[in-house]
Amino acid sequence: MRLFYFLVLFLTAFSAKASFVLLPMDETSQQNHLKAYGITFWCLDKQYKASWLLNYRGGSFLLPDAPEIRKECQIRGVSFEVLSDAEANQILEEIASPSQNMETVILEKAPKIAVYTPKGKQPWDDAVTLVLTYAEIPFTPIYDEEVLSDGLLLYDWLHLHHEDFTGQYGKFYANYKNTPWYIEQKKDAETLATKLGYAKVAEEKLAVAKKIRDFVIGGGFMFAMCSATDSFDIALAAEGIDICEPMFDGDASEANYQSKIDYSQSFAFKDYFLERNPNVYEFSDIDMTQKRANIPMEKDYFTLMEFSAKWDPIPSMLCQNHTQLVKGFMGQTTAFDRELVKTNVLVMGECQLNGEARYIHGEKGKGMFTFFGGHDPEDFRHQVGDPPTVLDLHPTSPGYRLILNNVLFPAARKKKQKT
């Protein structure tokens, strides 16, 4: 109850009128869930305090009432409700009740966001860049030069998407080796590696992966999707081992390299086998894409786990949504073989048809990481060269909401997980 009374005092300090703006996040009341995150970020950036009401109407946001906040909601098409002091207190009292699986989390400051992305145009979209732009949440693109010069120290949150940290150029060789974009990307990567003082792209990418690892250990938050998940772990575990075939680095791979993989260096995965064939569009058996061929598109959904908001606020924040059942989507790394997920990594979303892990979270040092399988939550089978998803057509996307949960998560006042 002491927490409840503190929150009441905290909220009454917002304005003399003691009224508040609620951004409802349930399925029927909010017309643009994605931009609601942007409004909340905008408020934090302007030094307003905000509260995230976990499991209350889909994970709603409580903001101070100010004319500029109402105006911004109207401009961006975000549904909001104006509450009196008494109404806000009643909601907080309901949330504070021990019988309710709800919690109030105070958001204190807008996190500084970096997106790891190359300077040139890629022949595929990046779901996180798309949704950050759509939600009007500012971010800074960074790449290898910035990472290797300790540029990550300037940020709280780092996103990685369709990346390959193993030096195998995304395993695109079989289908795209003669295409102009593949040839150009390979040349650019080699030029950059040489410029930065590395003999091979794989060595340079490993150095980048290690800087990202150190960023997390030091307290940073890393969010990765698609092939940035498993290729990152593989690169760390294969340090000092040549796993690249001649078409990638000019010489043969190391004999018996599988037996030399050090799984203890990986963040999330264990006991996996690497895919040696350069013509197979796969890094290892971590990915479920080829193992799940019997799951048709119309049945491809994953279920978000339910956590105790009061006792486990971290996974609760990361799983806030207006539905527990989220539409699946493919990627180079679609989902993770649950048998290969380390026991200290939390599975937050799984496909109940085959038990695969889709959405996982863990701690490393003082920091945290979240891995999310798949490429684009609103494009079931996004292909190379496909146009970017138009998010105006998907303003209430549950899959994109999961990405934005991760964006706002570093803004939360830290409270240690109790279980």
Model-found features: residue ranges?
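Helical hinge/lid and interdomain linker segments adjacent to catalytic or ligand-binding clefts
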Residues: V21-Q31, F61-L62, P67-K71, K121-T229, ...
